[in-house]
């Protein structure tokens, strides 16, 4: 790659994916005036298989694989991901090299009739495709009917507006980025619904031997966000977490100290194993591993073993 070669960003075609790609393009060009950046749009399996729950068709990696193949084959230089959709493992030669500043990590309650979860009547229908959200909702309100909800943000809002659901739960970050914040009736605090690993953060994946690109991406990295997400992902990696499993986690920084909360649960909310850990940010990944092992010892291993057996 020469200095004048355009940087090619592989991206899905959904509005949110395109927002993220343009966000990185703009940030790169702001940091390096005159740099040429192109978007290479593509369709992934996750965009095609919309009639089946994610947990049954292989999880969130479905949204990433085609982008990774494009990078490995030299058709693209980098891919931009919503961190909550990034699998724990990367193909050889690729890596997560940059994590941008985190947007709001909370879940959002969206409804045309009700202001929050507490206002929902008995047996109300709530839409989500996330086992993590389902598990925490069912623990708090066992009477609620959880109905599968797939598609991009606009599709999901359309289904709500068509009357298929009393409410839906979406990531607040996505609604804010698409300038749809007015659709949010209330935010669900982490104390009530722990977010997904890395929720609200945008990550950049590229070939780890592309030294020119690594240098260009350096100004986009947000160290506070990177430390928090590394902590959450280390926990998830130790749990071997994927889309098939209700895992929530959220870390906060206070100076150089990091506080990580996490949970593993049964999809029906009948059992949730929770834990938390505090330590120095330099030990972010070790803390994530330690908390994961504590969760496993306290009952998460049994939940995970059962869930993975069900999906084989």
Swiss-Prot record:
GO terms for biological process: protoporphyrinogen IX biosynthetic process. It comes from the Bacteria. The keyword Transferase applies. The modification S-(dipyrrolylmethanemethyl)cysteine is found at residue 243. Its EC number is 2.5.1.61. Binds 1 dipyrromethane group covalently. One of its GO terms (cellular component) is cytoplasm. Pathway: Porphyrin-containing compound metabolism; protoporphyrin-IX biosynthesis; coproporphyrinogen-III from 5-aminolevulinate: step 2/4. InterPro entries: HemC, Porphobilin_deaminase_cofac_BS, Porphobilin_deaminase_N, Porphobilinogen_deaminase_C, Porphobilinogen_deaminase_C_sf. Coiled coil: none annotated. The keyword Protein biosynthesis does not apply. One of its GO terms (molecular function) is hydroxymethylbilane synthase activity. Gene3D superfamilies: Periplasmic binding protein-like II, Porphobilinogen deaminase, C-terminal domain. Keywords: Porphyrin biosynthesis, Transferase. It catalyses: 4 porphobilinogen + H2O = hydroxymethylbilane + 4 NH4(+). It holds the Pfam family Porphobil_deamC. Its cofactor is dipyrromethane. It is an enzyme of class 2 (transferase). Tetrapolymerization of the monopyrrole PBG into the hydroxymethylbilane pre-uroporphyrinogen in several discrete steps. The porphobilinogen subunits are added to the dipyrromethane group. HAMAP family: Porphobil_deam. Belongs to the HMBS family. This is Porphobilinogen deaminase. It comes from Vibrio campbellii (strain ATCC BAA-1116).
